Every structure is written in structure tokens, then in C-alpha cells.
A protein has these predicted regions:
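Extreme N-terminal leader/targeting segments of oxidoreductases
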Residues: 38, 42, 131-167
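Glycine-rich FAD pyrophosphate-binding loop
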Residues: 186-205
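Conserved redox-cofactor binding core of oxidoreductases
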Residues: 251-369, 393-394, 567, 574-600
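An anion/pyrophosphate-binding glycine-rich loop and adjacent beta-alpha core
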Residues: 424, 433-555
Length: 676
């Protein structure tokens, strides 16, 4: 028996369906025309010219001419499509349609969006020619309508004021771009990096480098991590949506990369680094009862080396006021001082367009601070490393619809450190495929401030609603983001001083290993006791009885009754050692029964994030794929422009995983390109 492919089967089925439509249309005509049926029985179409429109990357218009039995001519207006992709596919698409005489064509590889729109136009024209009504072009989806997806006119060579010929061009000098730049420079490659920020104000955002198995960590007593265990744990937390090859590349190389990065750091600066969530204390938990594992492996740079814009004064050495920019400057200066013959950095110069030769990327056009256009021809490839799109509201509305649907009328996107998305735009214009679920750093997750898994959490109705210690802050906030708004309150009894010491490493988690942080938290409880029954400015309450605590929190009679019943039920669960309600790890089951009692009231909201952390689908070597999942020659993505590293949401089995991945995969990409 002859075998047919699934594609061939679908073509046959489609043709059969079209025949059925034809028969139905003719039957309708016969019923209407009566005695004229015999003379028109052989006709498939009403001769004439028909027009249809559809949405590709922009508006597409088709004009098709029909005889009684065939499509005789097709005209396509693809002027709103990408020059080198959709527009370039025009002749091929027309030929395929003419050969097939219907819309069941393969389309053009790399121009899937345009091909699908052309097929829709063909269907509509055929429907009209058969006496039916054209299907109205649907309202443009957010993806189709967003103006950023439409590529600008190509900048002509006549406007280029200077040309560079290099091996590799890198767009963006954050952690990934700088790491890739340094590696290529050390390998002797002719490399040029574009950085939009001026030299005098350039900095790299963030203060944690998450990694495993560096000599730095091991020398401080941090245990070695099994790479296979690490990969499987990561993939579980990423819902299986990360690229396991990229994650394993990170696991195997992050330690050596951090040691390499620190090798060029000023010793005085290096002495001011520390390890987050280290050392462990007697209460530290690393693996939860559900199997999720959390690791120590975060290097922090704690130095009040930058000024607070509001006060003009140096910041204190407190969490959230730390920057790694001195570490980045030391690495950049090392390259500038030692590899000026083959490595060039252009500050205040922004990449604006990729240079294409058909579907191949051959370089990039940039614009300097004076408005001049520069052309960089890159023999071995262009690296997109300009970060995410958290600073571009239109792109967030377009690319994060699942998150936007979670918002209340009072919530919206806010990412103060977000980039403008320009490198992602350039990649899309070149035909790059973005991952389906683009991850962000907490846009779709609500977390408790100073995330503490030990206390009982109740909602504004006084009821417990989830496992308080299910996972790290990002994953643990999924349910609240999708099901709750309003006040969330943490409930403690007088054993709070040991409860706050039991935790596990996590982004935004309470740092139980830092004595200053612990003392500051203990002071908040003492302050609540001093002003009882009133609240402190931080939202802490204290009362001698649970009844009085409920009153202080403002619960009405029904809420108060629910709250007291909730505490009673929770205490029963704690004493049994098994949380039959929500499955909480028994090590975090702390009964609420020894007065005085405390509460910390917060009102979580959705929409704030530091950055977006998702982008293009790539090969295992970070080469960008097109819409048909085929590599685009000459185009690569790293850092927060590269997708499929975290799954649907940023996760942190080690805090600082974003920067750690940027450094590691940026360097690995540099190695790969150097070997080309």
C-alpha cells in the first residue's frame, strides 16, 4: 500500500472539502436559476475579478481573476510586509497558487505569517467566485496590529557615513553582550559592540550573579551541586518549557564563567563581594516536600558606590541598593586596555536595522549620538543582546496578552529597568520566531514582601487560601495573581523569632543568613508590640489574644469568625504534622497559639516587574530560528533577548539566575562564534 504523508493527506482532504463546497454552491445556483442549470453545470466559478484582504505582518491585498473553470491571474500587494521576507516571497507564492489552483500550498519557508495571510486571501477570492460571501478579514489581533512589527524602510547606503568590517557585531553591552565581547576579544576575533548608553553613564543593572560550582563558592564552603539534579529541578520549575540544552550549558559552565569574570576584578572590589543566603543556619531548608530544590550560589556586590538620585547621597549597604557595575567596568576596562587592536566598543550608538542578504543577516546599521548612520558588516554573525522590552508599553501589551488578561482596572505593566525592545524588533523584522510564553520577572506573580514561608497566610475574609511554602516566591505567587486581590495577612505567634530564620534561597525571599536583615525584621515585631493595638508604618500588628488581633485588623463579625476558625484548623494541622488542606512542608508548620500574636498586613498587586526575560527561540548555540523553526543564517540572541531559558515565568532555584545565565550563555556564544 502506498503511504502518504500527513501533509499530503491534509491537501487531499482540503481538496475534497473544496469539491464539496463547489457542489454545494452549484446546488444553490441550480435551485435559484431553475432551467439554466443544465447550461451552467460544468462551471465552477462566475468569471470575473475578485479582491480580498487579510492581515500578515501588515495589510495584504489580493486581486484574483477567474474564468468559469480556473484561476487565470493573481496580483498581490505585499508592500506592508518585511522587504527581505514577505515581499521577497511574492513571486513564489503566486506561482504556488497558480499551480495548485486553490489555497492548499506549502507557502514560503521563513515567511509563514505572510504565507498564511495569502492563503486566506485566496480562500476568500475562491468563495466569492463561487457565489459565496467573502469571509471578512478578522479584526487585527494584538500581534498583527502592533505597529512595532512593521519594519521601517531600509536605510540606503547613501546615508551611511562610516563602514566597519568585523567578524562579529554585538548589539547591547549588558551582561550577555559584555561577556560575549570579552570572550571574542580574548580569542583574537575582530569584534565590535554597540551600546546605546553614553560611556559616562553606562551601567549594568542588577546585583546578584546566580551560578553553581565556582571556585569562588567552593572556597567559601558552599557545597558542590550535581548538574543532572540541577537540570531536572530547573526543568520541573520551568514547567518543561525551557530549552534543556541551554539550561545544562548554564549548569556546566556557570561556575567557570564566574571565576573567569572575577579574575579581572580589582582585589579591593572583590573583597566586598559576599554570598547571598550563606552560611546556612540550623533551620535552612534546601529541598521541599514536593521535591523542588533551592541552591546556595549567589554572588553579591555590596558597595555604596552609586548615588541615590533622590537624595544625591551614597546608598547604604542594604539589599536592593546593590549594583554590579564596578565588576562590569573592571571587565570592560580589561578588554579596552589589552585588546584595542581587535575589539571596539561604540558608546552612545544604537543598533537600528539589521543588514540582510535575502534571508541571511550580514550586518547591522547603527546610529550615533549625532544622528549619523554607521554600517557594520559582520562576517560571522550579529548578536542581539540588547535585553528585553519592559520599557516598551506597546510591546508588552502585544507580547504578554496572558498577563494583561490578569489585570484589574487598576493594574498595568510597570518595569522601571526595562529596555526598549529594539533588538527584539530587529530580530522579528528579520523573520525571527518569538517563544510562545515569554517569561518576565514577576509580571504574572504576586509575592508577599520579605517572602516568609513559615507563618499562616489569610485573605481579607480571614481564610487560609494556599500552601505558604509551596515554592519560591515567583511560583508561589501564581495562584494569587489569578484568583485573589485585596489584603493578605501573615499571622505569627510569639515564636516569630525562630520562624523567620527558617527559609530557603529565593529571589525576593527573606535573607535569614544576614544578621542585619534579621535584626531589622525583629525590630518590626518589637515596634508593633510598642504601638499595640495600632499598626506600625510597615503594617505590623500585635495583640494579646487572637480575638483582639482580629479586631485590630478590622475584620467584621463574619470575617472574624472565619479567621478564628481558620487558626483553629491550622493549629490542628500543625500538631498532626500533615497539612491535609494544602500540603505544606511540615518543617514550616508553625502553630499560632502562644501569645502575644502578630500580623503583617500587605496588599499585593500585579504588574510590577524588573525586566522581561524571554525572547527568541534559538538553537542550542543561540542561533535565532525563523517562523518555520529553521536557523536564520548570521543571527544570534543572548541574555534577555534569548528565549526558552525560564519557561513561562522567571524562576530562581538560585537567586540571580538571570544575570548568571546572561554571563554564562553570553560567553558560550562568544566561544561558538570564535570557532566559526
Amino acid at each position: 500500500m502506498k503511504k502518504i504523508s500527513r501533509k499530503s493527506f491534509l491537501k487531499l482532504a482540503s481538496a475534497a472539502a473544496m469539491s464539496g463546497i463547489t457542489a454545494g454552491a452549484l446546488a444553490a445556483c441550480n435551485a435559484a436559476s431553475g432551467s439554466t442549470a443544465a447550461s451552467s453545470a460544468a462551471a465552477k466559478y462566475t468569471p470575473g475579478t475578485y479582491t480580498a484582504t487579510a492581515k500578515g505582518m501588515g495589510d495584504i491585498t489580493m486581486t484574483a481573476t477567474f474564468s468559469e473553470t480556473a484561476i487565470t491571474d493573481i496580483q498581490l500587494d505585499l508592500s506592508n510586509e518585511t522587504d527581505s521576507i514577505g515581499q521577497a516571497a511574492k513571486d513564489d507564492l503566486i506561482q504556488q497558487l497558480m499551480d495548485a489552483q486553490n489555497s492548499t500550498i506549502d507557502g514560503v519557508s521563513g515567511a509563514t505569517v505572510t504565507s498564511d495571510a495569502v492563503k486566506q486571501c485566496m480562500n476568500d477570492c475562491i468563495t466569492q467566485a463561487m457565489g459565496g460571501t467573502a469571509v471578512s478579514a478578522p479584526e487585527a489581533s494584538a500581534e498583527q496590529a502592533s505597529s512595532w512589527r512593521t519594519a521601517p524602510e531600509a536605510i540606503p547606503d547613501s546615508e551611511i557615513t562610516k563602514t566597519y568590517d568585523v567578524d562579529v557585531a554585538i548589539i547591547g553591552m549588558g551582561y550577555a553582550g559584555l561577556s560575549c565581547y570579552r570572550e571574542l576579544a580574548e580569542e583574537g576575533k575582530n569584534v565590535l559592540v554597540l551600546e546605546a548608553m553614553p560611556r559616562e553613564s553606562w551601567w549594568t543593572v542588577g546585583h546578584d550573579i546566580g551560578h553553581i560550582n565556582s571556585d569562588y563558592l567552593l572556597s567559601h564552603g558552599v557545597p558542590k551541586v550535581d548538574e543532572v539534579e540541577f537540570l531536572n529541578n530547573w526543568m520541573m520549575q520551568a514547567h518543561g518549557k525551557a530549552n534543556p540544552a541551554l539550561v545544562m550549558k548554564f549548569a556546566k559552565n556557570s561556575g567557570s564563567t564566574v571565576d573567569w569574570w572575577l579574575d579581572k576584578i580589582n582585589p579591593d572590589t572583590l573583597a566586598k563581594t559576599r554570598i547571598h543566603f550563606w552560611p546556612d543556619n540550623e533551620y535552612t531548608v534546601h529541598q521541599l516536600n514536593n521535591g523542588m530544590h533551592y541552591y546556595t550560589g549567589t554572588l553579591e556586590w555590596w558597595e555604596n558606590s552609586w548615588e541615590n538620585p533622590a537624595s544625591g547621597e551614597k546608598n547604604n549597604n542594604t539589599a536592593g541598593q546593590l549594583e554590579l557595575k564596578d565588576l562590569s567596568w573592571d571587565n570592560y576596562n580589561y578588554v579596552e586596555e589589552n585588546f584595542s587592536d581587535n575589539a571596539t566598543a561604540l558608546f552612545g550608538t544604537k543598533g537600528v536595522q539589521l543588514v540582510m542578504d535575502g534571508a541571511k543577516v550580514t550586518g547591522v546599521i547603527a546610529q550615533d549620538s549625532d544622528g549619523n548612520y554607521l554600517k557594520i558588516n559582520a562576517k560571522n554573525g550579529v548578536v542581539l543582546a540588547g535585553g528585553g522590552f519592559g520599557g516598551n508599553k506597546e510591546m508588552m501589551d502585544d507580547l504578554l496578552p496572558n498577563i494583561k488578561r490578569l489585570f484589574t482596572k487598576d493594574e498595568d505593566f510597570f518595569a522601571p529597568f526595562g529596555r526598549d525592545g529594539s533588538t527584539i524588533q530587529m530580530g522579528v523584522w528579520a523573520g525571527g520566531r518569538l517563544e510562545g510564553d515569554i517569561s518576565t520577572m514577576n509580571f504574572d506573580s504576586m509575592t508577599m514582601p520579605d517572602y516568609l514561608p513559615g507563618p499562616l497566610w489569610v485573605d481579607e475574609n480571614g481564610q487560609r487560601f494556599q500552601n505558604e511554602a509551596f515554592a519560591g516566591p515567583e511560583i508561589n505567587g501564581f495562584f494569587m495573581a489569578r484568583a485573589k486581590r485585596g489584603n493578605i495577612t501573615s499571622i505569627y505567634d510569639s515564636t516569630y523569632n525562630t520562624q523567620i530564620l527558617r527559609g530557603f534561597p529565593g529571589h525576593q525571599a527573606f535573607n535569614y543568613s544576614d544578621p542585619d536583615v534579621v535584626d531589622a525584621m525583629l525590630a518590626k515585631f518589637e515596634a508593633a508590640k510598642a504601638v499595640s493595638p495600632n499598626a506600625t508604618e510597615d503594617g505590623f500588628y500585635c495583640a494579646d489574644t487572637l480575638d483582639e488581633l482580629a479586631d485590630a485588623l478590622g475584620f467584621d463579625a463574619d470575617q472574624k469568625a472565619a479567621f478564628l476558625a481558620t487558626v483553629e484548623e491550622y493549629n490542628t494541622v500543625c500538631h498532626s504534622g500533615v497539612d491535609t488542606d494544602f500540603g505544606k512542608d511540615p518543617r514550616f508548620l508553625n502553630a499560632v497559639e502562644q501569645g502575644p500574636f502578630y500580623a503583617h498586613l500587605t496588599t499585593p498587586s500585579l504588574g510590577f516587574a524588573l525586566v522581561t526575560t524571554g525572547g527568541f527561540v534559538t538553537t542550542n548555540d543561540q542561533q535565532v530560528l525563523n517562523e518555520d523553526y529553521q536557523p536564520i543564517e548570521g543571527l544570534y540572541a543572548s541574555g534577555n533577548t534569548c528565549g526558552m531559558r525560564f519557561g513561562p515565568e522567571y524562576i530562581t532555584p538560585i537567586p540571580g539566575a538571570s544575570i548568571g545565565m546572561c554571563l554564562t550563555l553570553g560567553r558560550e556564544l562568544g566561544k561558538y562564534l570564535a570557532a566559526k
